[in-house]
Amino acid sequence: MKKITTLLTAIIGMALMNQVSATHVTVEVPTAGQLSSLVQDVNCDSITISGNLDGNDFWFIREQMPNLVYLNTSKVTVPGNRFPESGLYSKKTLQKIILPDNLETIGNNAFAYCSNLKDVTFPKTLVTIEYHTFYQCDLSEVTLPDKLKDIGDGAFYECYNLKKVNFPEKLANIGNSAFRQCNLSEVAFPDSLKTIGSYAFYKCQQLQKVTFPEKLEVIDNYAFSECFRLLAATLKSKTAPTISDNTFNFTKVFYVPKGTAKAYKDASYWSNLVIIDGDTPKKITVTLTTAGT
């Protein structure tokens, strides 16, 4: 009996130690590159940092803080107001980050393969998200800040759980494969959008509703290919955007502004599609008479 009691006491003690190890740390870094000398508990699961950080500091966070779940960098300044390239690449423990308040760019691969990252707070100052920034993250909803103009190639590629994106009003470009194989069901683009890159929404197989904005100029190769639930779409532009013969493959019906159907049908590759003058009906029914058509 005494052995059992001793064993239970040891187990409870270990459990309490594990609970205690879940700690929050606050650190101020006056000079970039000094974070490693200021963090006293590298096993903490939560940290708030203020001051100045550089690539070496983010390497330390990535490689030397094995339990980190929450990271608040809202009061941090980084060189050039750019979150460093591959800064937290494959930091698989990370679940939430608050980005620096004055950040303008998130660098290539900054959070790629952060497979448990669910929550990102973006600053109002953000202008550019670069290549593969959030590749294969676990985001389910993203609200992008008002000043954002450019979403880079593969920025949210294979974020399989991403169901909703709130696009900002100044967005001009969505890069190649930016939202490829995401789980979006509906997309509402801002009027400012001009280009949608190749494969941008490729294999978004839950996508059912898309409205293309008035200033859109280009929808590139395979941008909406393999979106087999997207049977129809609406365009606000009176001038047909440039497309290719493989931009769409399941989407066959397009509703365009009244009086512009002929112009669309005369444009390259649009003549192969069904163009309908006027507003999108509340209910769309598409009948397939032959398999594969």
Question: Each predicted region: which residue ranges?
Answer:
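Consensus positions within tandem repeat domains that build extended binding/scaffold surfaces
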Residues: 87, 107-112, 130-135, 152-157, ...
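Short, T/G/N/S-enriched strand-turn elements that build extracellular solenoid repeat scaffolds
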Residues: 32-40, 55-63, 82-87, 109, ...
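Short, surface-exposed terminal/edge motifs of secreted or surface/virion proteins that either
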Residues: 262-269
